[in-house]
Amino acid sequence: MGKIKSEGDGEVQEYIDVCDMAVGMSRMIGGKVLPSERPGHMMIEQWNPIGSMGVISAFNFPCAVAGWNTAIGLICGNTMIWKGNESTSLVTVAVGKIVTDVLKKNGFNSVFTICQGTGSEVGEKFLHDKRLGLVSFTGSTKTGRHVAREVSGRFGKTILELGGNNAAVVMPDADLDMVLKGSVFAAAGTCGQRCTTLRRLLVHDSVFDKLAQRMASAYKTIKIGDPLDPSTLVGPLHKAH
């Protein structure tokens, strides 16, 4: 999608780290043991798998978002179908092959499947298929509303990670060096195409002018270009809009 190499490397590492975390969590999924009003009896509350779940991920994190969903979903005992974004299909295929090979080597066949296609062709089928007890969607708020409405209409469950309008608050005693460094990357990283992208700075009057001058100077140093060049911060936009 044009992401710079360091961000791409970080995304793969995030998938690995999530898998490590999920392994630990797999031994922590328990229920409650409750006392009963009947002498000599106890009540047990136990979590059970949903069954099959569908994962629809976005273009901006084509690897990591799938990792969060699949790693946690699998250790909860679910099977899943993952539809990556149609514009990052090579990532979906590559990650899917690696994960499938690892699962097969450990005796887990046919628990993880990928499928390709557009939202209207494939995604809509996820929303209406009653065999998918849960649909996890990452994308725009507008589409998220549609997903929630359609899946809840058949009494399915949803996990929605949608767009944001994020702000940073800068108080008079803030470390401006840290604000500058963090804000520039938060706003310009991934070409500003993240749900967590910084869109607004709420700055106290006493430091506004000083921060504005430093921010303008910092933006002039941002290198736009080849995402494989280590000095590049902003690669090509994914889409013009």
Language-model-derived ranges and their functions:
Residues M1-H41, V234, H238:
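N-terminal Rossmann-like NAD(P)+-binding subdomain of aldehyde/semialdehyde dehydrogenases
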Residues K3-I4, D129, S140, H204:
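Short loop-to-helix capping motifs
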Residues K3-K5, E86-S89, L201:
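Short histidine/acidic/glycine/proline-rich micro-motifs that form metal-
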Residues G10-Q13, D17, A64, L90, ...:
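A generic "alpha-helical surface" signal
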